[in-house]
């Protein structure tokens, strides 16, 4: 049996469960696959299979993540669930599993707990754009007023962290009851069906990479006699057509040029698009004007910045990270896309140091500007080894 071919008939959305430990994230994930499976939209993945998620390495960081997939009438979902709290933090910060939306699971028996807060804050910081709430274990709460109270508390917490708390769908149910039923039309399965409907209607279809403004991180620069300068790299998003204007952004002053040729596998094309490894021929550019670490981009689509706020996970000693804490004034390298740039870290007021294994929010000032926008991922390196992973949460200047 070869691998099944992935049939792309429906739009694809990446989603995941977040929330406090033991509030039922994994049970809900299993229940979704079961109910979707009973409705003929995927195959059931049992709790134990999800719970013993294999460990994966993302930029040298070990993360345990379970991936399941299921469909609704209109969409194909890829869903991530992490067994441990630390795995969530690493997952969200490294972007190992980019989420177009998240399902926040809150046990009605407990209400919002510390990790509920932390996951909402992280979702905000790393740019998970939409959340839907599943109020779990509602079968264990007899008091309707108590349910109302917990729902209100969750909505207020979401608003506090910048999500539209009043508008977010909140579905009440029991993940365990949904997991135990074999009838997709039963009252026990209904909340999971309602949750899937809420995901379909509330989480917008993500814009595809190809529809975004053109951007290609520059990996290499060649000069071809009689033709000019060629920059190579993998197109991250958008489309570049021969004859279009482009900008070279980052490290130095922004320079304008025109793309006079696109080639791939030594063949000339009239355009390159997201995912293609291409060489782009640039008019009027000298080889020494361009370097690895800059980006080729659609005019005015991205600006260079030096100072930003970051949400960062610092590798533990066991993951090959530092053995000692660092303090304000620490100067490691920040690896953005294709290159390392030195930066100086300023910890938040009242934070004395950051220990290996911590996640932290701090400010970074680079020695040279990089083409940057909110949500850009980076690695922190020291002498060539990765000691942290982060995401730009806010641009300061």
UniProtKB/Swiss-Prot annotation:
Pfam families: GTP_EFTU (PF00009), GTP_EFTU_D2 (PF03144), GTP_EFTU_D3 (PF03143). Residues 174-176 are annotated as: G5. Residues 136-139 are annotated as: G4. The keyword GTP-binding applies. Residues 81-84 are annotated as: G3. One of its GO terms (molecular function) is translation elongation factor activity. Mg(2+) binds at residue 26. Keywords: Cytoplasm, Elongation factor, GTP-binding, Hydrolase, Magnesium, Metal-binding, Nucleotide-binding, Protein biosynthesis. It comes from the Bacteria. InterPro entries: EF-Tu_GTP-bd (IPR041709), EF-Tu_GTPase (IPR050055), EFTu-like_2 (IPR004161), EFTU_2 (IPR033720), G_TR_CS (IPR031157), P-loop_NTPase (IPR027417), Small_GTP-bd (IPR005225), T_Tr_GTP-bd_dom (IPR000795). SUPFAM superfamilies: EF-Tu/eEF-1alpha/eIF2-gamma C-terminal domain, P-loop containing nucleoside triphosphate hydrolases, Translation proteins. Its EC number is 3.6.5.3. It is found in: Cytoplasm. The keyword Hydrolase applies. It catalyses: GTP + H2O = GDP + phosphate + H(+). GTP binds at residues 19-26, 81-85, 136-139. Residues 10-207 form the tr-type G domain. Residues 60-64 are annotated as: G2. Residues 19-26 are annotated as: G1. Monomer. GTP hydrolase that promotes the GTP-dependent binding of aminoacyl-tRNA to the A-site of ribosomes during protein biosynthesis. This is Elongation factor Tu. It comes from Nitratidesulfovibrio vulgaris (strain DSM 19637 / Miyazaki F). The gene is tuf.
